[in-house]
C-alpha cells in the first residue's frame, strides 16, 4: 500500500515530452497532422485579416458623402465574402484532420496498452496494478491523451497564429499604440495562467476525494448482501458522507478561484480598452492617426491577446495528456520478467511431462514478508498423478502457480523434462499445460466461446465432445440458447458446478500433456462431483497430473500423495502406505476429516443453488469488479467502475432489454422546479448569486454600446475628442471593476449552492441505493452543473439579452430588426466555436464501453488468459469491439470539421449583410454612423456572450438526464426497504422459523421456478440442515430468511409473525450470516470483525469473538496483528482465514438465528475442524440453518431436510432418513459412499 501512495504523490511531476505523444503515429497520421497544422495556421490568420478589413470599413463609413460612402462600403463588404469562403475551407481541414488522427492514434495506444498488460507477469497484477486501474487507464487516460493530440493541437496552432498575426498587423498599422497596449498583455496572461494552474490543482484534489467516495460505493455495492445482512448501511453512508464533505469544500474553493481568475482577466482587458481609447484619441490629435487606424490596432491587439488567453484549455489538455501518457507509455515499454509474447526459448518436439521443483525458495511479490517456500522440492514422474494435501495457506496452490510459471522462484528451479521452465518458450509450454482451478473463471461471452478458449479454431464437433466428456452436455442442452447462452460477468449466470464443468471442458479441448487441478471439484455437490470426477479420470489417464485438494476422498487413488506443511513436504507416499503410520501427518489429516469410518461419506457437498457466485479462497482472484454476487437481482447489470472525470461513478452495463427500458425512462423530463426544490435550503445563497449574475450579464451589451460610442468619438473635432476620451476611458475602467467584483461573487455563491446540492443528492442516492432491494444505480456525474452553473448562466444570459436588445432598439430599430433576424446564426456560430474549444472527447468514452468490458474481463481473469495463452484471442475480440467506435470517431471528426467551417462562413457573411444594410440606411437618412455601430456591437456582442457562456456550460441535457436517473433512484421505493422504520419488533426472539406454502422465482430469471409451495418448520434452538442437489434452492432458503427477497406467494414466519411485518433492520440484526464466500471489506481485520456489531465493539469483544472463531492465533501471528489490512475482497488472506474472520463477525453480533451457507466448504481438514468446533459452540441455544455439502456437518443436525424440485422431499434425523429405502437422503448418502 505504501508504494502506491508514494507513487500518487510524485505522479504529478511525471510527464512525457509533448512530441513523444505522437510516437505511435503511422504515415497516414503524419500526413493528416501536416495538413491539419497548415490549415490551422491559415485559420489563425483569418481574425487578424478581419481586423484589417474592419479598419477599412470604419474609414469607409467615416467619409462624409453618403453616395461615396455606400460605394466604399460595398468594396470592403466583398472582402468579407472572400474571407468567409477561405475560412470555411481551412477551418474544415483543421478540425477534421486533427480529430481523425487523434482518434486513430489513441486507438493504437489503447490496443498496444491492452496487449502489453496481457503479457505482464502475474506478479505485476499482484503488486503494481488492479483491474480498476487498467480499465480506468484504458477508458479515462487514453481519452486525455487523445484530447492532447487531437483537435486541441489544431486549436492551439490556430490561436498562436492569431496572436502572432494580430500583433504583426498592430505594429504595422500603428506601432506607438500597439507598443502601449502590449504592456497589458502580460497581465492578462498571468491572470489566466494563475487561474488554470490553481484550478487544475484543485480539480486534482476534488478528484481524489470523489475517487475515494467512489471506492466506498464500489465496496459497498460489491458486498451489498454482507452490508445488508449486518445492517451496515448506516456505517457505509457515514463513511461516504465524510468523503463527500472534502469534495464539497474543493468545489466551493474552485468556484471562488475560477471567479477571481476570470474577473481579473476581464478587468485587465476592460482597463486596457480604457487606456487604448484615451491614448488613441491622443495619437489622433498629436500624431495624425485616423480613426480606422486606431480601431484597427485596438482590435488587432485584443484579438491577439484574447487568443493567447484562450490557449489555456489546450495547454491544460496537453499537460493532462502528457501526464496520462507517462504511465501508459511506461507500461507499454515494460517488458515483463515472464513474457508470454517472448518467442525465444526452446520448443521441443513433444514433452513427456516429468515435473520437478528443485530446492525452490519463493515469496509472493505482494507479500514479501511471508516466506512460502524455503527449499521446497518435489518430483512428479510423467503420466502419474501427484496429490498435494495440507492446511489452508500451506502453499499447495503455489506449486501450481509455479508450474504454470505465473511466478518464477527466487532461487531453485522448476523443471519440465529436466529442462528449466525459464529456458522453454512460455507460450508453447503453457499450451501443453491444462489448468482447472477452484474458482473457474469464465468470460462474459457465450458458453461456446468460453470453451473455445482451450484451442484455436476448434470445430463444433470437438467442442461437443469436450462438453460431453466434462458431463456438461446435459445442462447445456437444457438451456434455451444451448451453447450460445451468455454466461454473465465472471460466470454469474451459472451455478458453481456448471461453471466448473465448463472449465473442465475447456481444459479437455486443450488436450494438455500436464494437468493441474486446483481444488477442481470443491464446488460441486455429490452427484456433479461424481460425474466431474469421472470426467477428470478420463482426462487424467496418460497425463502428468498435479492435484490440490481438500477432500481426501478425491485423492486416494493418486499415485503419490504429498503432505505440504508450512512450505515443506513433510511426508509423501501412497494413501495405503501413509495411512499405516498412525502418527504421520497424513493419517492425522485423514482422521481429522473422517471423524469416524462411516463419516468417510462426508464428501456429501450438494453445491449451492444456481444463484451463487462461488469462491473458496479468493487469493487467486483479485477480480476487482464483480457483479453484486449471489443471485442478486442485479446480477445482470454488473457494476463497472468508470472513473468518470467528475465522479468515479458506478456505471451499469445492462442487457439489451434493460437498455430499451432505460431509454424510455430517460425521456421523462425533469422539471427544473423539482431540482430547485432539492436546493431549497440554499435559496438565500442562490438569490445573492443571481443578483451578481444579472449585473455580470449586463456588462457585455454595455461594452458593445461603449465600443460604438468610442468609434464615433474618433471622428469628432479635437476639442470634443479630448473631453470624451477621458470620460469613456473611465467608463471602461468602471466596467472592468464591476466584473472583478461580480464574477467571483457569482461563482462563489453558485458554487456553494451547487456543491451542497450535489452532496445532498449523492448522499441521498447512496443512502437510497444501500437500502434498495439489491438494485442498480447510475452515476450523478453532472447533476451539480444543472443547478449551480446552469442557473447562473440562465440568469446571466437573460440579463445579457435584455440589455443588448434595449440598447439596439433604442439606437435604431430598423437595423436592430435586420441584425436580430440574423442573430440566431451568430449564436449558433459562437456556440459551435466554443464547443470546439471545450472538446468532444466525452462521447468517445461511452462508445468504448463494450471494448472496455472485454478488457475488464480479460484483466480480472488474467491467470486464465495466461494459462490458455488466450492473449491473441482477447486482442482480436477487443479490436473487433473497437472498430465501430473508431469509425464513429472518424465520422465525428469530419462532421465537426464541416460544422466548424460553416460557422466561420456564416459569421463573416452576417457581418457583410449587416454593414451593407447599415450603409443603405445611412444613405437614405434612416440611420447615423454611430447608430450603425451601436446596433451592430450591442447585438453581436450580446450573441457572442450568450453563445460562449452556453457552450462552456456543461451540457445541460446531460445534466437533465442524470437528474432524471437520480430522481428515478430517489423515487423508487424498494419493495424491501431497510431504511424504513416501520414494522414491529419483538421484546425477545425465540427463533421459531416457518415457511408456509412458499413459491418463489428470482426476479432476474422468471422462467426458473425455485420453490413450489414449500413448507418447512424450524423449531427454536434447533439445528436444521438443508441438503440437495446443485440448484435445488438450498441457499435460497437462507436468502429468504434474511429477506433479501420476498416470496411470490406464501409466508415466512418468525415466532409466528410474518417477517414482512417486522422492521427490516431489526430483523437482520437478529440473524448472523456466514456464507460460503465470505466477503471482507478492504480495511483492517479489526474493523472487519467489528462490522458485526451496530454501535461499535470493544477490543475485548473483538478478541473474544476472534478466539471463539479460532482466528485469534493466526491473527496474532501476522506482523501487524489485528491491524493487518485484508486487501481488496480479502485477497491477502487464505480461504480458511477469511472464513474464520467472517465467523467472528457473526459471533460478535450474538444473533438469535444463525444462517450457515456452506460455511466450511472452503476449508481444509484442519481449519474445518477448528471452524466446526467454533460453529458448534456458537450454535448452542440458537436456531441454526445449515446448508452444507459435507455429511459430518449435517449428521448431528436435529433435522435434516432434503430440498428437491422446489419442495422439501424428506425430513428427519440422519438415522431415520437412512432407514427409508430408496429415499432421497439415503441415495444421496449412498452416492457418497460409492464415490469413496
From Swiss-Prot:
Q: Which UniProt keywords apply?
A: ATP-binding, Glycoprotein, Membrane, Nucleotide-binding, Repeat, Transmembrane, Transmembrane helix, Transport
The residue ranges crossing the membrane are: 38-58, 80-100, 158-178, 179-199, 257-277, 288-308, 685-705, 725-745, 785-805, 806-826, 902-922, 927-947
Q: Which Gene3D superfamilies does this one have?
A: ABC transporter type 1, transmembrane domain, P-loop containing nucleotide triphosphate hydrolases
Q: Where is the ABC transporter domain?
A: 355-591, 993-1230
Q: Which domain of life is it from?
A: Eukaryota
Compartmental location: Membrane
Which GO-annotated molecular functions does the record name?
ABC-type transporter activity; ATP binding; ATP hydrolysis activity
Q: Could you tell me which residues belong to the region Disordered? A: 593-616
Locate the ABC transmembrane type-1 domain: which residues?
33-320, 686-958
InterPro entries in the cross-refs: AAA+_ATPase, ABC1_TM_dom, ABC1_TM_sf, ABC_transporter-like_ATP-bd, ABC_transporter-like_CS, P-loop_NTPase, Type_1_exporter
Instruction: Provide ranges: composition bias, Basic and acidic residues.
Output: 594-616
User: In what way does this protein cross or attach to the membrane?
Assistant: Multi-pass membrane protein
CDD domains assigned: ABC_6TM_Pgp_ABCB1_D1_like, ABC_6TM_Pgp_ABCB1_D2_like, ABC_MTABC3_MDL1_MDL2
| UniProt GO cellular component terms | cytosol; membrane
Q: Name one Pfam family in it.
A: ABC_tran
The signal peptide stretch is none
- Is Nucleotidyltransferase included in the keywords of this UniProt record? no
Q: Where does ATP bind?
A: 390-397, 1028-1035
**SMART domains in the record:** AAA (SM00382)
Q: Does the keyword Iron apply?
A: no
Which residues carry attached sugars according to the database record? Answer: 542, 631, 653, 1082, 1181
Membership in a protein family? Belongs to the ABC transporter superfamily. ABCB family. Multidrug resistance exporter (TC 3.A.1.201) subfamily.
Q: What is this protein called?
A: ABC transporter B family member 9
Quick one: which gene encodes this?
Answer: ABCB9
